[in-house]
Amino acid sequence: MKNKENILITLNQVGIEQYSNIIYNPNYDTLFKEETNKNLKGLERCILTKLQAIAVDTGKFTGRSPKDKYYVRDEKTKNIIWWSDDNNHKSNNHPINNETWKDLKKLIANNLNNKKLFVIDAFCGANKKNRLKVRFITDIAWQAHFFKNMFIEPIEQELNKFLQDFTVFSVPKAINKKWKDHKLNSENFIAINLTENTLLIGGTWYGGEIKKGLFSVMNYILPLKNIASMHCSANEGFKKDVALFFGLSGTGKTTLSTDSKRYLIGDDEHGWCKDGVFNFEGGCYAKTINLSEEKEPEIFNAIKKNAILENVMVLKDSNINFFDGTKTENSRVSYPINHIKNIVKPISQSGHPKNIIFLTADAFGVFPFVSKLSYFQGQYYFLSGFTSKLSGTERGIIDPEPTFSSCFGEAFLSLHPTVYAKILLRYIKYYNSKIFLVNTGWNGKRERYSLEYTRSIINAILDDKIEFIDENYIPIFNLKIPKKIEGVPDLFLDPRNFFSSNEEWIKQATILSKKFIKNFKKFSHTKLGKKLIKFEPKINF
């Protein structure tokens, strides 16, 4: 086994002294044999489906647990992490001390000692100058499979000299019974130590915690190098034109960027440096609720051997009912990016974006279907991050909830939101990227905008077939709207058409405007926030 000595050092650093076996960088056939072993019980065991993908059940953990995310507060991090106890603007980055960290390491070690361990070395980041070498360790075969799907596999020469920058331990059975003594939120934890370069995940089986944990790490490392770290998907046209799609989970990042007419760069997490845009991952993590081959053929056809279906309804004949949300509305599939036919070459890297699209799921129905933003409006809406939390993406979310998520990914930001906004908008200005706001939510009749019409809007943006004039705008928000888009009824372009009267639209728009104004007060103490106040909604128009 390559790197055995280094692996043993890694294990010893957390207190793992004995193991029954180490399976290093297993291939998919080995993982399949391990994860479908009939001796496995409960959430460890996987089911082979008719689509040849395996299906896993993550128990009660069908979404992320943001209240269970922690950073060790020490000399390195105390003055730079955006902490949950920040008086001006609280985050999800809850502090723990070194004593609690040591206890969590012991818990991980106790759960992994004398176990069969799966160890996978991979890259987080397709750009060679800015990637992170990651070692992943778990005792659960399908979690190793998930990591293998989601990150970038080194070639043999790279493995021979692989020394990790960061280590991830994912141990779902490591339940912290001392959580009250540690003053934590629950018995589960996603704990990051940036001094020891280690991420510990315990108590939760949800695969998304693995990828989002490393996303949080990249969100710390890259901005300190003046590189934009972004919660977005990305694709490239036949003319090498790059588009970014920002948005919270469930707003359409994966669906809209996976397009047969364009090449996929990545579906969720990207960096933007002087070389261009690069994906952090080597796989995709798509929502599957109501998935059909007719509406989303690329994603549907990616569900095959080596894919992992998470929390889907498996029928007795091993077929999948993608329309059954009994378990969760947040059912998912993880697959290697090469399951998508149209991907960029070299994989997961491209040039600088021509178009940037903010996806917002407006639950009020007052936002236009599409609008064009000025540079400063782009800063304001990026910092505001208005959208709706959609069903199942976090534990406890059932109906769409209007929310503000700074940078369209507040839960994953390690530093203050203004850090990301300044860096991103610097790149946008330098490379003259255009910014659009697309509403993938609801109209005033509480009807969800259709995927068909949304794709027509995206196509119009990317093909330069959308025109805006200053005189055609939505008041209060001062958002420019087009008069006509091929494939979209004119009625849909002005949100006021879906209200019983203009007064009713104004009433709802005023309610939302007040939420914008209230939310942006958390930036009023910052230099950037003071600069952007004048771009907030105007209630008395």
From Swiss-Prot:
Lineage summary: Bacteria, Pseudomonadati, Pseudomonadota, Gammaproteobacteria, Enterobacterales
Known catalytic reactions: oxaloacetate + ATP = phosphoenolpyruvate + ADP + CO2
Record PROSITE patterns: PEPCK_ATP
Pathway the protein acts in: Carbohydrate biosynthesis; gluconeogenesis
Description of how the protein assembles with itself and partners: Monomer.
Protein residues bound to Mn(2+): 212, 231, 268
Protein name: Phosphoenolpyruvate carboxykinase (ATP)
InterPro entries xrefs: PEP_carboxykinase_ATP, PEP_carboxykinase_C, PEP_carboxykinase_N, PEPCK_ATP_CS
Protein's gene: pckA
Chain positions recorded as ATP binding sites: 212, 231, 247-255, 296, 332, 454
